[in-house]
Amino acid sequence: VSSAASDVYKRQDPSSRQHGTAHILDLCEAQWVCTLPAHHVTSGCWSTRGKQLVLGLQSGELLQLTPEGEVKAMLPPLPESERSLYVEDVQWLENHAFLVTYNTCPPTAEHNQEPVHEYEVFMIVRDPKANTMTYSAFPLDVAPPFGDTSRWPCRYACTLRDWMPMKHIVFMACSASTDVGVIGFRHAWEALELEDTSRPVLPFSSQDETSDTGPVALALDLSSTDSVPDPNAAAKGEDPSATLPAVPILYVYTNDGVLLAYHVIFTEAEAPYPGMVSIESNPAFSPSALPAPTIPQPSSTPAP
């Protein structure tokens, strides 16, 4: 939906009264709409049509509900896990398909605890007729924590849909990783390997030019109108100066204050990306300062 957004603001102090609550903010009306009936929320994502959303919980469960707070379904946590896991990130890709990243729950709730980066990435597919769930693990994490592991865990993801022959292309980054990985679905889900010269890699810190940097935001720009050079023009026997139609731009903002931009070029694409949009000259709304949402006191009644 154009008037709503999904994001998670993490607090290092779990004792905070606002810890784990979820709120709906209407961006067009510039007002808080409601507080959702969920506790210990760790992540969230809108459905593809923006009519519902799914919240990942500290218990490892997924709560599906409407923006008005009506609970539609509860998806169980990862079965037979030897560790206590919470939902670090959830991407609602199709009506019954969820890309979920789990992380190990910290052993304590102390403020000075060490960050934990023990991720597991799963594709969860729900069969509504048989009322069953299929959990399929990715053998490798495409955004492993091989960078600054002193940063608090956070997963970032954004998706391109129906860029045939790929049904889904998911870019994924981790707060403790220096790379941006890619997961795709053509005939099956798989981690996509990019050439070294084409792989998004975050630069060293501008402070000392040796320290790793990590992402703090990841987004796609679908409004570009500029053509881009075709990297395979010469290999195809075409004019080396040949260009491709405008493509999506992947933005990565780092903790060093650097904004990186990458053209997303799909060399096997059957046509330009169908999700490109045009930007109106006048914005639909102008954001204004908002008061903080009113947080109700915790109730003794368990959440639905």
Regions found by a protein language model. Give the residues of each.
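Single conserved hydrophobic/aromatic residue that forms the stacking wall/gate
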Residues: 1-5, 9-12
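Loop/turn segments within WD40 beta-propeller blades
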Residues: 3, 45-50, 91-95, 163-166, ...
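Intrinsically disordered, low-complexity Phe-enriched regions
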Residues: 17, 31, 44, 52-53, ...
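Per-blade loop-tip surfaces of WD-repeat and WD-like beta-propellers in eukaryotic adaptors/scaffolds
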Residues: 17-33, 61-74, 124-132, 184-189, ...
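Conserved beta-strand position repeated once per blade in WD40 beta-propeller domains
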Residues: 43-45, 89, 217
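Eukaryotic scaffolding regions of large macromolecular assemblies
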Residues: 105-108, 113-303
